[in-house]
Amino acid sequence: MPALSTGAGSDTGLYEILATLPAQLQPHVDSQEDLTFLWDMFGEKSLHSLVKIHEKLHYYEKENPMPVIHSATALAEELAEELQSKSLNSEIRELLKLLSKPNLKALLSVHDTVAQKSYDPVLPPMPDDIDDDEDSVKIIRLVKNREPLGATIKKDEKTGAIVVARIMRGGAADRSGLIHVGDELREVNGISVEDKKPEEIIHILAQSQGAITFKIIPSIKEEPPNNDGKMFVKALFDYYPNEDKAIPCKEAGLSFRKGDILQIMSQDDATWWQAKHEGDANPRAGLIPSKQFQERRFALRKPVVSNQPQKVPNRKSSGFRRSFRLSRKDRKTNKFMYECKKSDQYDTADVPTYEEVALYQRKPNEKYRLVILVGPVGVGVNELKRKVLIGNSQHYGVTVPHTTRGKRSQENDGVEYIFISKHLFETDIHNNKFIEYGEYKNNYYGTSLDSVRSVLAKNKICLLDVQPNSLKHLRTSEFKPFVIFIKPPTIERLRETRRNAKVISGKDERGAAKPFSDEDFEEMIQSAEAMEAQYDHFFDTTIVNDDLSAAYNELRSTLERLEMEGFWVPVSWLHS
């Protein structure tokens, strides 16, 4: 690229832009061919000449010079006539020769045009026989390379015309700004689309390479200002457009998995939104079902997962486990006593489609987020929680449970339990003060919301393990919970790693802890699958407890990241 230079005192702004643009654009250019094109384009002499003209005009625009005379051409002609009548000497002959030169006449003509400001084009008069109903036609030429055009078409049921149904955000059509929803398509590359089906036109477009020429009649409907692209949602279901019979164009669909963060680019269509994956450098959006449309489809489907927990013979409290404390002396009672009142273990949650989210990172003066551990019986939730507490008891804490049973001699109120009367416990139940509660041997046991608040008030991270049906009640702006699902490995790994462990939910006839059986392993896996099927849209991360040490290290790393990094949370948590 030739060196750029300007005269002394001229504005170098545009020259600096031209000189730096190729280097600035280099990280965003995919091929060396495109980069060479940019260097050649910005090095064109004609472009530099235009820049010089622009700067000269800009200079005179600021100076605003006034013409001394508006008719220099007429003055020159009068002067020439007068000189013809004089005696001709060498100087007069030279002046007459100069005034007759075409270049000077053209210069004076341009001067008069600028002085009189008569440079605006004069349009011809409108013809008298024009049809008032005739539509204006626009010719558009787009270069789409190998990417899709980024627009869908449909046949207008009333007029039979082929119209643009949708413009995909970030696609070639959207970037051009020349094609709009509602535009009527007349020709593609000189081929009339009259009496053609949309599928035939799509085939023509697919066969076209490089530049495509459209003849369209612009839509008269004004498009509202585009404020899209600022909304982010968390997907609460898996979606594969190739399997969706309702999508208008499978190729335009965007596939995603449960838990993916999507940036919503357009909600103009009530049935099909346009979105892209958060952080994706590709500007093109894809079609996804709208929240309302997907909710209607889910509502029409029959539930495939039973709400009733698995029944296991001779297991008095199968499917439930609750350790209200980690280092209490009577753990043998609490391990198997808990049964939630009025609780199906896997209740029917709201129809999960999308949840609007925003990026959140805790500020130094804010309380810590509540950390919830969820997992099936025997998976090791309590052991992982215990190891975290042992590792840093000053930074992490657990709740103290409430009970209505009598205090034993070696117990202290507020340490092992918070001891309250049955009447007060039932009053607190009525006032929804308990996260979970149960009854064992005519005594109530429960975890209260205030016990969570008490841990957080000490500037500690509260570690809480609950049944999954309690999650939706804890997902509030007050607690901003981070939910970790502890998942069992395969049954083969369970047999290998836990065969010699002691079951925590039952005793044999002599009161000794029983080893895990295949029945326990199967129940653990089935319980985990049921939890995932119904509640995994609440889970922020999943840890497979294949090896306790590895699972603990992963848990500790997750807790450290939670304090240092931003995470996506429901937007309602930040606005309340």
Curated annotation (Swiss-Prot):
Q: What is its main location?
A: membrane
Recorded superkingdom: Eukaryota
Q: Which UniProt keywords apply?
A: Cell junction, Membrane, Repeat, SH3 domain, Tight junction
Where does the record place the L27 domain?
Answer: 10-63, 65-122
Task: Give any Gene Ontology cellular component.
Answer: adherens junction
Subcellular location(s): the record lists: Membrane; Cell junction, Tight junction; Cell junction, Adherens junction
* Domain Guanylate kinase-like, chain residue ranges per copy: 368-560
Its record classes its membrane topology as: Peripheral membrane protein
Task: Indicate whether Transcription appears among the record's keywords.
Answer: no
Q: Please state every residue range assigned to the domain named PDZ.
A: 139-220
TM spans (from-to)? none
Q: Tell me if Membrane is a UniProt keyword of this record.
A: yes
- Where does the record place the SH3 domain? 228-298
Family statement? Belongs to the MAGUK family.
Which function does this protein serve? Acts as an important adapter that promotes epithelial cell polarity and tight junction formation. Involved in the assembly of protein complexes at sites of cell-cell contact.
- Name of protein: MAGUK p55 subfamily member 7
Species classification: Eukaryota, Metazoa, Chordata, Craniata, Vertebrata
Q: Which gene encodes it?
A: mpp7
